[in-house]
Amino acid sequence: MIRRHSCKGVGSSVAWSLLGLAISAQSLAGTVTTDGADIVIKTKGGLEVATTDKEFSFKLGGRLQADYGRFDGYYTNNGNTADAAYFRRAYLEFGGTAYRDWKYQINYDLSRNVGNDSAGYFDEASVTYTGFNPVNLKFGRFYTDFGLEKATSSKWVTALERNLTYDIADWVNDNVGTGIQASSVVGGMAFLSGSVFSENNNDTDGDSVKRYNLRGVFAPLHEPGNVVHLGLQYAYRDLEDSAVDTRIRPRMGMRGVSTNGGNDAGSNGNRGLFGGSSAVEGLWKDDSVWGLEGAWALGAFSAQAEYLRRTVKAERDREDLKASGYYAQLAYTLTGEPRLYKLDGAKFDTIKPENKEIGAWELFYRYDSIKVEDDNIVVDSATREVGDAKGKTHTLGVNWYANEAVKVSANYVKAKTDKISNANGDDSGDGLVMRLQYVF
């Protein structure tokens, strides 16, 4: 028997309902016999309910990432030390299957680092049709496919923040809008995806900006601890008669300089403008990005790298905006466990600790480098000199997978820039950020 609780507010009612469902499920975990298909209830790693005939299922899960960082130099406007304490992500995730061939996924970000007040704080809200096997069709709001690190869940990326190359073309794999994507595993050794996405930007006729993405990955070896991964991707959008923000303002690997979800560095946080402009109608013709990705894993060791190049063609009497970047990363699990890998999606997954007492310990190093060429900047300013702006970071980190639900991380980041500085004239900075993650 389920009792109804009276709570003030819809959010409170939902929270109590989910709590009651979870508590009830703990006592009912196992197989439940019904007059139709039997129901299997699992409570390890969230709440999962499914029929034995696999026609219907749902799973309630989530992730919580609590970060704390301290940083100075380039990362702050005056060069002095600032700190930030915030929830990087706080997702409630609900997904499952309906009538076997339909999959659904809804992820809502309670930290408000995804989305906005008008569109909702949805990380994802999508429906996937799998009846055209091996091709899957996804509809709704989701992250368009571009890049190995973006394909990998934020729960299991090695560094706390993804590589800098995504900051020079942040639209290629974001989720701002709605669209359709077709994807497929090919021949048991490759993954292909293509999407058309309607962005939340319009031209003068009210027609939304359309984004087109293609990604192809060849992975003849794709077992845990034995991975060879080579990929190519391309993204394009038509910006004619549109007002689109093309500013390139990387955080240089330190989210706390400017973030939601808690307390950031406030007005002293520095996000330098490397190039581009605010949303002004008619400045740009189109925007195209292509990239390369590669990875190799052997036992507890893994290496990966990506390269990205962007060209924004000018519409008026302006110069084109060009940007490029790359990163290279090495990681090693001291306790011997390999990184898991999924060919469907062409992405790395978690590290599962073999020793329940000490967990799994991973060390890594990553080098990032970006360059932005904006010849529309013809006069030096207090923080930006004429010429190509460059940025690079060295990131050294450790991840402790205490168990399959808890992950503790610490990253040290050293940044260096050229042709761009903070208001104090600093072109280098240091930062330390830590995270406690819980997933269910």
Swiss-Prot record:
It is found in: Cell outer membrane. Its main location: membrane. Keywords: Cell outer membrane, Chloride, Ion transport, Membrane, Porin, Signal, Transmembrane, Transmembrane beta strand, Transport. It holds the Pfam family Porin_O_P. Residues 1-29 form the signal peptide. One of its GO terms (molecular function) is porin activity. Transmembrane segments: none annotated. It comes from the Bacteria. Anion specific, the binding site has higher affinity for phosphate than chloride ions. Porin O has a higher affinity for polyphosphates (tripolyphosphate and pyrophosphate) while porin P has a higher affinity for orthophosphate. Belongs to the OprO/OprP family. Homotrimer. Trimer pore size is 0.6 nM. This is Porin P. It comes from Pseudomonas aeruginosa (strain ATCC 15692 / DSM 22644 / CIP 104116 / JCM 14847 / LMG 12228 / 1C / PRS 101 / PAO1).
